[in-house]
């Protein structure tokens, strides 16, 4: 049989084409089976869907897939390869969004909801105030963000905290001096501090911001107002949270910062980070040293941090974090009261660590299981007494030099103050605050307009205090747990609401319930042009705070318990309570370029803790304590009430893409309503505490009198920031100011004759101040930059409480080097 050659080759070509098409189809089918699917939706800050948004999926520097959103904002794109990806999203009229990097493996379906900010405004999201990532435009809470760029030339966070509304920062001394935060007139231990979801404050709320380094701080979020619903006790005035950065670059990147300045100041910092397939990593180490301006007041702080993440798949991630700080400083005391420096030292060690399992199920059910722990140790030593020793009936008393103490209110006192007492030296003391706990939290998105959040948290808190000189060896342990649930949603993308509540079971004070309700609405939605965007806000909430260890261990109940006594009606020290409501308006004056915010708040602090003398406990509370209680001079009780109300204003101006300015002003009206301190009861009895040089003026020697302002809460505070940013050059001027505030010298019966001539009237005793800082950064190359940070340009000496001189003008100059990272 003979075959035509043309037919043979034609048949071969047909079979080849058939096989090729089949093979290509098989490849496509196999690729689709192995593809990473990324889906979600694109919305504006008010939750409205954005159609025709362009979405690009980047792997490294390459665009591996792209697509556009549908009219309802939904999108879905696929990539044939696995690895780490970034979503880049843009749409006409909106700012470009660069999402957080994520891992996607074969067959993974990754859900990523995207929010595009209005043009020229970087989208800001709060998590602290709501528990869920929420655009600031949808939140009714009063929240401010401090970005990592704001901290780029700072060695700490203290001066940036001054640049926030409603916040009063008080630092007793210079670098490393104890720094407290008073928010909206609240107490200094009423701020919950969170590091990667780990409670960082002491048992009972105390936290020293003066030893917190800016190293490994990926910006701070400050929620003003109580949030006991989400964070339990101690979040009675505010919540301050920050996270350790994540590694994001495909190649390892090493960042180094080195600088030096006056007062023998130097700082070195190194950061190593990156991400490879399922793993992301970040580590950091720094040390800061300064001699300060007083003798024997040298300060140093060393910080180390790590953040390691591992993605099991596109929806489940494991993460572990640790942050450790070790610091030491002098204890010079109130130099202006003695004219001589005390010979003391304080050392602090703080370690915060935690681990999480994070899972998203089918895109709308999010679950997190977290273990957290903290270890905080503080040691203080008074090496030897300073001053002149004078013998008396009760031993030696050491007096400082002759000084004139001048108050900001025009009063003054001249003399020698008692600054130390005889005994065995050195005199050490130490305390520890440890915490371990577990938390499970879950949130479910029913629709784009309604979400639910709930959590359960268990904490095991332990504390000890040892002071051999005072024969104190105390310890305490608390096991607490709480439940909370919260609904969050919107109506027609115009009215946004938050409704939640929590039940806490505290070892000391039993069960407490805390509600919360927030509402935000837009009579005029944001847009371009004049006065196009009006947001109204309202919040109501209650908060509770547990006592700190020192007040618990010195409470009447514990003192009786230690003596083996019980008295009817005397129970453990109770919860401190707060009820607050606030309302405000955010008004766009000209689009997103000029914004004005106004807020009014009213706080009622009840059942606050104060020390009450033994005779007053018997007279006013009807409690007679037998003589068998050792060293009983009084005890801590829930007997103090005070109020705080005020207004907060903020103004932001984005003149151009290079120039930005913002400012704010806060007025605070606070008032002590009820107190049983010894000074108050002495005044009630007709024998007020006075200074013989200022007769007729009642003085609160250790706490404020009824009708007066609480100590160290300035009635007027404010700030302004002017910043210029270009491709290679960045400069900023930042200023904070504060009016005079009430305080005490705490020098009752402490002059050379045992009198009160150095105890000055409380009203406006602390000085007001204006602090001006400036920084300049120049980018020489993409890998190398130089900078200068200048602080206290006006050389203000009275930015802290009376008696404690502030660090005068100081500066640091240094360089930043970046290696690797692609």
What is each stretch, according to the model?
Residues 56, 90-94, 105-150, 158, ...:
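Short, acidic, small-residue-rich periplasmic hinge/interaction motif at the N-terminus
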Residues 112-114, 157-160, 177-182, 194, ...:
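N-terminal periplasmic accessory domains that precede
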Residues 158-199:
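Extracytoplasmic beta-strand/coil segments of soluble accessory domains associated
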Residues 198-225, 306:
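Short acidic/polar hinge/loop motifs at secondary-structure boundaries
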Residues 262-289, 294-329, 342-374, 439, ...:
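Transmembrane beta-barrel wall of Gram-negative outer-membrane proteins
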Residues 279, 364-382, 463, 522, ...:
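Membrane-embedded beta-barrel scaffold of Gram-negative outer-membrane proteins
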Residues 309-311, 346, 707-822:
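Conserved C-terminal beta-signal and adjacent last beta-strands/turns
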Residues 490-497, 602-604, 623-747, 785, ...:
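Gram-negative outer-membrane beta-barrel transporters
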